[in-house]
């Protein structure tokens, strides 16, 4: 499993899900946000075999990757446990361990499509978790709040024609 800023989830380089987050103000005392809301959409299954090759190469599901036996409840429980572990680590040790873990799983050498059609080059995360991008020739830090306005959320299509998310 790998990630692409700001929130695309890949299984074996196929798009499988999307995470969106929003947060409250960051405490100057702890460096942690006062609150955070996380939304996740994950393609659990789908009839990929009948789809065009290009679609199958770009998309996948838990079922396609051999994990279709995992129930929605167990998946949600596992995600919540992992999220709380990393949130606790952030509170106790600062953002650095979270930064390192995320960076190790991030897709490398990626060009990101901005909602207005421009392309941004992915450079990495800064110490506060903002995405560092090269946009219009300039290096910029894009906060979590700004990323929601800058990037369109990927559509988890069931088929090339549907546009419907599972």
Per-segment meaning from a language model:
Residues 1-15:
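Conserved kinase catalytic-core segment
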